[in-house]
Design a protein with these regions (language model features):
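Non-heme di-metal
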Residues: 1-146
Length: 146
């Protein structure tokens, strides 16, 4: 769905998907975490997709300042959906931590370090992250490390 929304918007502006450079961070992290579902849940939805929660509001503000309300609305839809994606990853991460007898917040920090993962984007979208399952204490600890 997100691909179709973005592609439709790009086409309405005279472009298409693939016309602009993009990073492969999600795919690269998925490859790095092959074989460890706990690391995958920590670092794909809880880190990289959560970074999208943080990055979206500033991008929306820039689009709105440029008068591109249609693109900002597309990002509203995606942001709402991504909260659910991050939340699903959070629930699986916490379940797997419980199954392995691991404390989630320290495990998350350990995995960030072990995989040399990028840090959260600041300012963090705390409301979206809380809705997705992060605790206020965890957000405070992450903010200190950034």
């Amino acid at each position: 769905m997100h691909f179709n929304l973005l592609r439709q918007r790009l086409r309405s502006l005279g472009h298409d998907y693939g016309d602009f450079p993009a990073h492969a961070g999600l795919w690269e992290m998925a490859e790095k975490t092959t074989g460890d579902v706990l690391a995958r849940m920590a670092l794909v939805p809880r880190l990289l997709e959560a970074r999208g929660l943080d990055a979206t509001p500033p991008i929306q503000r820039r689009l709105e300042q440029a008068g591109d309300m249609a693109s900002a609305r597309v990002l509203d839809i995606i942001l709402h959906d991504e909260i659910g994606h991050v939340g699903l990853g959070d629930r699986w991460f916490r379940y797997l931590c419980s199954e392995r007898g691991r404390e989630p917040e320290s495990t998350y920090r350990d995995l960030l370090s072990r995989f040399k993962a990028p840090r959260p984007i600041t300012p963090m979208n705390e409301a979206a992250r809380l809705e997705a399952g992060f605790s206020a204490a965890e957000l405070a600890a992450l903010a200190e490390k950034v």
